[in-house]
Amino acid sequence: MVLAVSLYVNKMTSKVSLTNDQLKDLGLYLIEPARELGEFKLIDSFNNEFVPDDFKGRWNALFFGFTFCPDICPITMGMLSRIEKELGLVAENKIKVFLVSVDPDRDTPEQLKIYLENFNDKFIGLTGGIDQIYNFATRVNAPFSPVINSEDPNYTVDHYGSIVVINPEGKYAGFFRTPHEQEKIRLGLLELINKQL
């Protein structure tokens, strides 16, 4: 395992692209050709309208979850925060991390902002109408089971665990499958940074 990671690190520093099989070993599955996202309008955690074109110009890592999630969401956001800090200037303006809410009834822009500040103040939350979110999630193969008008205030939402990748052209480019391993995702993101736009 250590040898394999070392080989990946050597390839990264020499800017040699990894093969698709090597990317899959890192848990990164790229889709070729990348797919259009379609149209949607969401609201970000700063109360600004967010549309597909807002993904353009950088790589984007999206996790579909919710702020009341008891396990995989905080674990994943914490891991992505550590990765972002490890990458430092290498990733500056080249990768943006998003939490896309699958629970818009509870996840207001303000709630998302407060939640994400616990992990990384560079992260952006996205929320909006359940139909808009569901259609977007379907486009990027991130299924979830919407909960509408639940009488239980402590309800949970079943959702996808992988990390969706959107390329600098604003297209669905692939995903990091579960289970997540921090070092592998870091190396996969480095490979994306090294790719030509």
Where are these regions (language model features)?
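N-terminal targeting signals for export/organelle localization
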Residues: 1-39, 196
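Short loop/turn microsegments at loop-to-beta-strand junctions
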Residues: 37-38, 60, 160-162
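Hydrophobic beta-strand positions
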Residues: 41-42, 165
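Short active-site neighborhood of thiol/selenol oxidoreductases, capturing the structured segment around
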Residues: 50-76, 80
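Conserved helix-turn-beta segment immediately C-terminal to the redox Cys motif
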Residues: 58-59, 76-99
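Thiol-based oxidoreductase modules, predominantly thioredoxin-like and allied folds used
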Residues: 94-107, 122-131
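Short, internal strand/loop/helix patches
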Residues: 113-160
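Thiol-/selenol-based redox modules, centered on thioredoxin-like
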Residues: 151-197
